[in-house]
């Protein structure tokens, strides 16, 4: 099945979202799958929790990285919503935290950051 048909549009950027209770390893596998064949102009945002631990993930396609979008910077800002921290590279970043109730706000922050960087 083509996962991209489930994408939403944020400020003209194709955006895949994973939200809810998911094992972080499943999210990481999804990122690698998307990275292997991601069309241009694509991001993946994940705000998940498992066993009381929230995790955020951002993947940014290479063309958007070349335009200045930086997953590492965005994840540090969004991680505040889950009382956590994280980092990574311009194309892929993850964060963990202590406040699983904050994943909804974290997703909203990530969406706003994508729109601001578009």
Residue positions per predicted region:
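Glycine-rich, acidic loop segments that terminate in or are immediately followed by a histidine
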Residues: 13-118
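Hard-cation-handling environments
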Residues: 1-11, 36
């Amino acid at each position: 099945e083509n996962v991209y048909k489930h994408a939403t549009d944020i400020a003209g950027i194709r955006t895949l979202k994973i939200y809810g209770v998911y094992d972080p390893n499943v999210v990481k596998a999804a990122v690698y799958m998307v990275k292997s064949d991601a069309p241009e102009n694509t991001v993946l945002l994940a705000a998940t929790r498992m066993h009381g631990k929230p995790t955020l993930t951002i993947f940014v396609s290479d063309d958007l990285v070349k335009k200045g979008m930086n997953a590492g910077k965005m994840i540090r800002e969004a991680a505040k919503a889950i009382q956590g921290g994280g980092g990574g590279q311009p194309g892929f970043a993850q964060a963990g935290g202590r406040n699983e109730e904050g994943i909804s706000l974290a997703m909203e922050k990530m969406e706003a950051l994508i729109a601001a960087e578009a």
